[in-house]
């Protein structure tokens, strides 16, 4: 284990050199001290790009004998900062509870399918909700992993559920949105659209709860808003394929909306950001579904993230920097994009390694992403420049989770990693 970790860290320098020339580029801008998360003009990372990200520990979590033929570890860990625990799924059909300090296993819950879902921890009940590729959605005790209830949704569940309004909102791969009672797992209401078989690529959107409505996207290219309590449609389905056809002059071959909608408040009102795989990225009015702006050049998008930076005082004594935000789009075909949230205008674009990258996760003023065929990277949200990277021989497909300066992720080889990102001083 120690020898493998040493090789992993030793490969960092060569990896950074290769990527700076062929993919993400070398860092030119980074982040301010952790006290405000801002990005100074001359960050420490500019002088020490190879020491921003450190591995605290690695733990081989998934035994080769238990793997069930899935070469990737997907989903995203869930952090319980009070209990100092991390919950993560695996390709060995299990959900693990680990001690955040050292990665030691607390318990493991067995399902009959890959657990590629991002778990949801509820600190009020001290329980974990998660889905499996066996088609079931589970509620288990966070203390000992004992089953509370299981709901069969009849299709894989890999997106994180949302707990709000006294209901659990769950989406499965069969284009079904469910509102479940947390105490029993019984259905309060459900909505379903016929899947566009053969017109989707991979993955699907999760639920967003925003201003009393639940938003999600479907494989037929539609985005719909429902009343969070009753499930009634709150605006007519928005067909992003039709929107893209008007711009492109033809119907996209891949209709699916794979990104979980992302909310924002613009000066003109509330919006949700969504992406059609072949049609581009769109901002929709959150109240009506009317298009605010499109960017049809940003195709192949699987994840969206809204990065924010608070207003701050420059360290060089210059004028105060205003608050700013950037919409980050992850695409395995067109790269990593930074877009203006108000207009959709491209601010920057970076090529990514073959196989694409995960959703970017804000940490210490930067963004952490993983590459399915390479490893873990830290990039600047202001320009996408590479700050640091760690090569992983099996690659890393799982989206990392961050709390403060700590991050957790599992590699495709089944090794669970704890990392620290040092902020510039």
What function would you assign to each model-found segment?
Residues 27-30:
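C-terminal motif of bacterial Sec signal peptides marking the signal peptidase cleavage site
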Residues 35-79, 108-124, 147-164, 187-211, ...:
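Extracytoplasmic beta-rich repeat domains
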Residues 86, 128, 168, 214, ...:
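Hydrophobic beta-strand positions that form the internal "hydrophobic ladder"
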Residues 89, 131, 171, 217, ...:
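Residue-level marker for isolated small/hydroxyl-bearing positions within beta-strands
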Residues 93, 134-136, 175, 221, ...:
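Short coil/turn segments within WD40 beta-propeller repeats
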Residues 99-102, 141-144, 181-185, 228-230, ...:
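Short loop/turn segments that connect beta-strands within beta-propeller blades
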Residues 330-337, 345, 349-378:
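Loop/turn-rich, solvent-exposed surfaces of beta-rich toroidal or solenoidal domains
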């Amino acid at each position: 284990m120690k020898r493998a970790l040493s090789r992993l860290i030793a490969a960092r320098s060569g990896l950074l050199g290769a990527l700076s020339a062929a993919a993400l580029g070398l860092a030119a801008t980074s982040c301010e001290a952790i006290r405000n998360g801002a990005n100074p003009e001359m960050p420490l990372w500019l002088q020490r790009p190879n020491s921003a990200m450190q591995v605290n520990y690695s733990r081989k979590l998934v035994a080769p004998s238990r793997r069930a033929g899935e070469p990737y570890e997907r989903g995203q860990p869930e952090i319980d900062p009070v209990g100092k625990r991390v919950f993560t799924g695996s390709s060995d059909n299990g959900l693990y509870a680990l001690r955040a300090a050292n990665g030691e296993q607390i318990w493991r819950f067995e399902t009959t399918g890959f657990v590629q879902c991002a778990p949801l921890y509820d600190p009020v009940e001290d329980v974990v909700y998660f889905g499996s590729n066996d088609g079931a959605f589970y509620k288990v005790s966070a203390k000992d992993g004992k089953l509370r209830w299981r709901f069969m949704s009849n299709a894989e569940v890999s997106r994180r559920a949302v707990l709000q309004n006294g209901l659990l909102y769950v989406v499965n791969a069969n284009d079904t949105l469910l509102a479940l009672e947390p105490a029993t797992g019984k259905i309060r209401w459900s909505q379903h659209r016929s899947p566009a078989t053969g017109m989707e690529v991979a993955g699907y959107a999760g639920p967003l709860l925003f201003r009393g409505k639940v938003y999600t996207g479907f494989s037929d290219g539609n985005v719909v808003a429902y009343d969070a309590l009753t499930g009634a449609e709150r605006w007519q389905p928005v067909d992003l394929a039709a929107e893209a056809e008007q711009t492109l002059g033809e119907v996209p071959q891949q209709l699916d909306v794979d990104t979980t909608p992302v909310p924002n408040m613009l000066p003109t009102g509330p919006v949700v950001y969504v992406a059609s795989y072949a049609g581009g990225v769109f901002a929709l009015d959150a109240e009506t579904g009317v298009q605010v702006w499109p960017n049809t050049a940003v195709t192949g998008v699987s994840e969206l993230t809204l990065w924010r930076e608070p207003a701050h005082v420059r360290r060089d004594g210059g004028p105060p920097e205003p608050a700013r935000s950037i919409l980050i789009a992850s695409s395995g075909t067109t790269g990593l994009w930074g877009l203006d949230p108000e207009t959709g205008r491209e601010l920057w674009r970076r090529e990514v390694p073959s196989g694409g990258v995960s959703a970017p996760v804000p940490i210490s003023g930067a963004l952490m992403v993983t590459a399915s065929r390479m490893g873990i990277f830290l990039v600047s949200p202001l320009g996408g420049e590479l700050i640091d990277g760690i090569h992983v021989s099996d690659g890393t497909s799982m989206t990392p989770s961050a709390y403060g300066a700590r991050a957790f992720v599992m590699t495709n080889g089944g090794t669970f990693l704890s990392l620290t990102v040092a902020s510039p001083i």
